[in-house]
From Swiss-Prot:
Uracil binds at residues 193, 198-200. GO terms for molecular function: GTP binding; magnesium ion binding; uracil phosphoribosyltransferase activity. Keywords: Allosteric enzyme, Glycosyltransferase, GTP-binding, Magnesium, Nucleotide-binding, Transferase. The lineage of its organism: Bacteria, Pseudomonadati, Pseudomonadota, Gammaproteobacteria, Pseudomonadales. Its cofactor is Mg(2+). 5-phospho-alpha-D-ribose 1-diphosphate binds at residues 78, 103, 130-138, 199. The gene is upp. This is Uracil phosphoribosyltransferase. Pathway: Pyrimidine metabolism; UMP biosynthesis via salvage pathway; UMP from uracil: step 1/1.
Amino acid sequence: MPTREIRHPLIRHKLGLMRRADISTKNFRELAQEVGALLTYEATQDLPLETYEIDGWCGKVQVEKIAGKKITVVPILRAGIGMLDGVLSLIPGAKVSAVGVARNEETLEAHTYLEKLAPDINQRLALIIDPMLATGGSMVATIDLLKKAGCKEIRAMVLVAAPEGIDVVEKAHPDVQIYTASIDQRLNEHGYIVPGLGDAGDKIFGTKQKDA
């Protein structure tokens, strides 16, 4: 599936604020949650609905609810946690399935070091969240893991994506829809997205260097 770049004015505005070199941890964290929530709105807009009856103030009322599969949110640790509260603000009943993926900074290869999945994940729509889609290695490793666990429907949300990473994921898993706030220019020689956001994990957790 082709990657969807969500160019909503609110998303563009908030993402612009996140790109500032002097942004504080507090502001970066809050904006990551806000953009995560806005992307969730887009990524779930085609969920099926079913009608049921309730007792309203004026009698019986026909209302709607989401039908079919339930959702599990899959943050890729550690940076994915920064988007989690924003996503859960819209789907508070979702189960959280955490996946830890580390990238070798020399080879840029990804390896999984932790998985804590919902026990019924094979019956749920998996919504992967990670601020950055750079080389695509972490995303592919996570999707591989979820499919091995029996997931039939997987979607991914990222704040910014590099064309190189998109290409890797789309070739490895063409059935997975990616939603992003921005498709950026490229990866640099160190595997970082340009212009990107810098190291999103460091900025979310307050571990970035003063000159970062």
